[in-house]
Amino acid sequence: DDKPRAASAMARDASRLLVLNRATGEMGEDEYRNVADYLRPGDCMALNNTRVIRARLHGHKDTGGRVEVFLLREETPGLWIALVRPSAKVKPGTVVRFAGGVSAIAGDVLPDGRRRVRFDPPNVLDILESVGEIPLPPYIRRDTPESGDLTRYQTVFAHRPGAVAAPTAGLHFTDEVFAALDAKGVDRAFLTLHVGYGTFKPVATEVLEEHRVDPEEFHFPEETAESSMRPAPRAGASCLSAPPAPACSKPNSGRVPLSPVPAPQTSTSTRPTP
């Protein structure tokens, strides 16, 4: 199937937009570049500004064996939770060497099969720009990354590095779409949810609510919550997020207050359900 490959080359805002008229129940299709047509002055869009990191590293042992390290989460500077392949052939204490003089020591295998990996030097996020690869989502069926992947699978407003997969709902926005939203009087607010490896986990349960989601780190600024609770300039204005799949509803039912979290940085395993 060539559709996933073709989709990656499509203009961002040419993606299809599913439109539901909540008053009539009628559904239709449009393109995302026209999303401003379905919003009203004073509406506020909450957007995830996470930035995808080059989480996949290819290295080798001193014996010459190839090793792949897929970074998941940084615990302390230089110490990461990661997937190591082939795990059975990488014993605890094994040194893995990467390009640019970067090395890492593999720790014990954790109960879930993951490993702690300590890097030298410890400034891993800076190192990734030169030695890492961006992880391709499973629906992109090719073995190796292409030069445009890091741009294509990054939102135009990506800011805080830490995700191993793009927040796909945000990929449809362009500067032109934002210009149209600005002209319409639609506000924007940003929060951060670092999309983790669990997003690739298939649903293996009959009951959706029984599907367990890996915790993901998020940062919810107080100013974002305040933006959602600020009095709207006109009746009926709403606060809405970029949905998991392109969708838009109208008319909206009213501004939705969002509460700031007690800590600036924490994690969640909450999942949206229909």
List the predicted regions and their residue ranges.
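Surface-exposed, charge/polar-rich loops and edge strands
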Residues: 1-274
